[in-house]
């Protein structure tokens, strides 16, 4: 009988210890990120992994700037964009572009040039003249300063990447090798943007004109899209409902990535406010899908 009681107590003690160790193990692991967090919301950008010592050294050497132009890279070092990643750091956020060469990771960064107006327009454009393919087309960063990006087929060959901010910023660009990566860091500033951020819809981004801008004839309209069969309808309508101008123009891509378009439209003088509509028709039901921006007549705005 004594042996039977001892056996029961030993069994209970083992069960308690096992349960406690199991709970302790889960607590040490900490909270787990939600499954498929990189895919929610849709087109959410892949999160950046830990910073290497090479990157940390580069950070200390490269200051943030508001320079409108910058360039670098090596001609022929890569032929494609493999991935765009997002990272949060103390005081700034990062977009990292990974490159490919003949189907494998590139070891160096290809030739690039950057154009930006950090305190004026809220985005930076990095052009890669030697890139002709991409595995990424667009994505949402969802950061406090980094907002989203688009990969666009450039009008003169190659591709460019537009990285949008939520407000004014300073930036820095760092090249990393083995594998080749170009990192773009944004640090927010307290300045106000001088121009509205370009209007964006699901399949259309309009750069010219901006919301509320004063316009005269002829008007240059430019942007990029992924509208069905690369077709973009541009229509200027007066506040009375009268159509002042209408034109259809093709972008230079739509099936592989975003395609650039530009056009010039003519129209008579008008009073008050008009609405510029740019986009395409839904292949499902024929309804309009695109952006609408208010404009006024004249050179002010």
Describe the residue ranges of each PLM region.
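Bacterial N-terminal signal peptides that target proteins for export
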Residues: 1-9
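C-terminal motif of bacterial Sec signal peptides marking the signal peptidase cleavage site
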Residues: 17-20
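Bacterial signal peptide processing site
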Residues: 22-24
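Bimodal "functional hotspot" detector
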Residues: 26, 36-43, 177-179, 190-203, ...
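Post-signal peptide N-terminal segment of mature Sec-exported envelope proteins
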Residues: 29-57
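Signal-peptide-cleaved, periplasmic/extracellular N-terminal interaction regions immediately downstream
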Residues: 47-207
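Ser/Thr-rich low-complexity repeats and stalk/linker segments
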Residues: 209-301
């Amino acid at each position: 009988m004594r042996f039977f009681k001892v056996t029961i107590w030993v069994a209970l003690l083992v069960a308690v210890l096992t349960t406690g160790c199991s709970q302790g193990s889960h607590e040490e692991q900490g909270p787990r990120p939600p499954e498929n967090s990189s895919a929610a919301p849709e087109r959410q950008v892949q999160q950046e992994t830990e910073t290497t010592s090479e990157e940390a050294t580069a950070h200390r050497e490269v200051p943030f700037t508001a320079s409108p132009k910058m360039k670098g890279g090596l001609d022929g070092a890569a032929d494609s964009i493999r991935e765009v990643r997002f990272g949060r750091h103390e005081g700034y956020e990062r977009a990292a572009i990974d490159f490919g060469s003949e189907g494998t990771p590139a070891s160096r960064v290809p030739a690039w040039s950057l154009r930006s107006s950090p305190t004026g327009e809220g985005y930076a454009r990095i052009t890669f003249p030697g890139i002709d393919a991409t595995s990424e087309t667009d994505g949402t960063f969802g950061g406090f300063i980094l907002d989203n990006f688009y990969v666009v087929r450039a009008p003169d060959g190659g591709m460019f990447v537009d990285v949008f901010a939520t407000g004014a910023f300073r930036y820095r660009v760092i090249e990393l090798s083995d594998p080749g990566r170009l990192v773009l860091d944004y640090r927010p500033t307290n300045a106000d943007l001088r121009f509205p951020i370009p209007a964006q819809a699901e399949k259309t981004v309009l750069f010219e004109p901006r919301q509320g801008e004063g316009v005269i004839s002829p008007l240059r309209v430019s942007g990029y899209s992924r509208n069905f069969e690369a077709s973009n309808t541009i229509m200027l309508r007066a506040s009375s409902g009268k159509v002042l101008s209408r034109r259809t123009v093709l972008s230079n891509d739509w099936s592989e990535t975003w395609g650039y378009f530009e056009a010039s439209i003519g129209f008579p003088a008008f009073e008050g406010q008009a609405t510029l509509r740019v986009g395409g028709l839904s292949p499902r039901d024929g309804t309009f899908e695109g952006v609408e921006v208010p404009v006024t007549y004249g050179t002010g705005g």
